[in-house]
């Protein structure tokens, strides 16, 4: 059985390991960077199996933060009432088992409870991440724009899904 719980500072090492295993789909991060992200998140969840082994996590942020992410800044310039998914990362072993959907259901439930109009995120087009794009399409995410980031090294598809 999988347990979903809020991330704590005690999870930082596991979050870094899972995060960095997802490169290049997500940017590499240090423990200090993950702690900084956690401090900005309105919702950060970690999934664990029966023996407490971390399987994945998701981090989401409310609008109005001083967060210099190019993608967050893009959404802030267009939407005022959104919940931004900064990242979702699953271990290789836990992909395809429905865990991403379990985490996203909690994101959408939170967005609805908080009166958000939409959930926003981005998916890499370059380097390509077709599995993530398919996943987001199944969740009703629609294209908003594309954007080169990191000096053109990464190109992302900026997405939004209405909260119903």
Question: Predicted regions span which residues?
Answer:
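A short beta-loop-alpha structural element at the N-terminal edge
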Residues: 2-15
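Active-site rim helix/loop that mediates acceptor-substrate recognition in acyltransferases
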Residues: 24-50, 59, 65
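Conserved acyl-donor/pantetheine-binding loop and adjacent beta-alpha core of acyl/acetyltransferases
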Residues: 59-87, 151
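C-terminal "cap" of GNAT-fold acetyltransferases
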Residues: 77, 146-164
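A short, internal acetyl-CoA/4′-phosphopantetheine-binding micro-motif in the GNAT/acyltransferase core
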Residues: 86-95, 125
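Conserved acetyl-CoA-binding loop-helix of GNAT-fold acetyltransferases
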Residues: 90, 96-109, 138
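Conserved active-site alpha-helix within GNAT-family acetyltransferase domains
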Residues: 101, 125-145
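Conserved GNAT acetyl-CoA-binding A-motif
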Residues: 111-125
């Amino acid at each position: 059985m999988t347990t979903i719980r809020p991330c704590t500072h005690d999870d930082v090492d596991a979050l870094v390991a899972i995060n960095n295993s997802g490169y290049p789909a997500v940017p590499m991060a240090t423990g200090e960077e993950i702690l900084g992200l956690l401090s900005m998140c309105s919702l950060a969840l970690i999934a664990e199996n029966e023996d407490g082994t971390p399987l994945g996590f998701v981090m989401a942020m409310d609008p109005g933060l001083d967060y210099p992410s190019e993608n967050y800044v893009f959404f802030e310039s267009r939407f005022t009432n959104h919940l931004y998914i900064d990242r979702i990362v699953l271990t290789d072993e836990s992909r395809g088992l429905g865990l991403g959907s379990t985490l996203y259901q909690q994101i959408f439930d939170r967005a609805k409870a908080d009166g958000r109009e939409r959930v926003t995120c981005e998916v890499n087009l370059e380097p390509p991440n077709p599995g993530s794009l398919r996943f987001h399409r199944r969740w009703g995410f629609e294209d908003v724009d594309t954007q080169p980031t990191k000096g053109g090294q990464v190109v992302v598809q900026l997405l939004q899904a209405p909260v119903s």
